[in-house]
From Swiss-Prot:
Similarity-based family: Belongs to the pyrroline-5-carboxylate reductase family.
Gene name linked to the record: proC
Enzyme type, top EC level: oxidoreductase
Subcellular localization(s) per the UniProt record: Cytoplasm
Name of the molecule in the record: Pyrroline-5-carboxylate reductase
Matches recorded under InterPro entries: 6-PGluconate_DH-like_C_sf, NAD(P)-bd_dom_sf, P5C_Rdtase_cat_N, P5CR-like_CS, P5CR_dimer, Pyrroline-COOH_reductase
Length: 261
């Protein structure tokens, strides 16, 4: 068995789905462990993979931990095996804490974002030396490449990555909602306003892949036109500063979660 999933929430299911659809994993190479044998069967059945008990984990080459961080301290002794590699997608839990709790230094830390559900995640990876040497990091890189882009970054940047990239879908959803509400205020039907806001964000994302943000802004904002007046209103409300503060607050909270361990 190449990979055992411990827990299978929204992100875990999306990772498994992407790996199966892209052919990186076959169903017979995967197992899923839930809180109870019944839950393991419920989680495994839709994907045609194997339901596991805790005793079965030792048959896996690697384990992907996809539980809530608060559940990990109690769970760790039950899933710890010296010969396995571990990949964690739990927010705020460092590689050093993973290694200590699991009594195993073959650990990879990963941070995908919500776009994993559509195969467009930006996933950060970091790993201890032992995980690199055992090719656990290479395995994780290939696994997460099935659901988006992968970035290997130093662990000291993980909280900032979480505060900016992992949280970005929520920030941008607020932007989309605010744009739509503004359109409704101007008399636009809500369904149309929501669709236009979503289309605008998607199109802007594509434009930004090949351009600096300032270039996109300048191309839209003609002298004396409507857009530059709208931008002036945003600057007057310190929208840039609000994003700075949001990323700083989320980064700080990620650090606090790690410190609590």
């Amino acid at each position: 068995m190449r990979l055992a999933f411990v827990g299978l929430g929204k992100m875990g299911r999306s990772i498994l789905k992407g790996a199966l659809e892209r052919g990186f994993l076959r169903p017979e190479e995967v197992g899923v462990l839930g809180r109870t044998p019944e839950r393991s069967r419920e989680l495994a059945e839709p994907f045609g993979v194997r339901p596991l008990t805790r005793a079965d984990l030792g048959m896996a080459e690697r384990v992907l931990i996809a539980v809530q961080p608060r559940d990990f301290p109690a769970l760790a002794p039950e899933i710890a095996h010296h010969r396995l590699g571990y990949i964690s997608i739990m927010a705020g839990i460092s590689t050093s804490v993973l290694a200590r709790r699991l009594d195993n230094r073959r650990v990879v830390r990963a941070m995908p974002n919500l776009a994993v559900v559509i195969g467009e995640s930006s996933t950060a990876l970091t790993a201890l030396k032992e995980a690199r040497e055992a090719e656990d990091l290479a395995f994780a890189r290939a696994l997460f490449a099935t659901v988006g882009d992968v970035y290997e970054i130093p662990e000291h940047l993980f909280d900032a990555f979480t505060g900016m990239s992992a949280s970005a879908p929520a920030y941008l959803a607020v932007v989309a909602e605010a744009l739509a509400d503004a359109g409704v205020k101007m008399g636009m039907p809500r369904a149309l306003a929501l669709r236009l806001a979503a289309d605008a964000l998607a199109a802007t994302g594509e434009l930004l892949k090949g351009r600096h943000p300032a270039q996109v802004k300048d191309e839209v904002a003609s002298p004396g036109g409507t857009t530059i007046h709208g931008l002036h209103a945003l600057e007057a409300r310190a929208v840039r500063a609000a994003f700075y503060e949001a990323v700083e607050a989320a980064t700080r909270r990620g650090h606090e979660l790690g410190e609590s361990e």
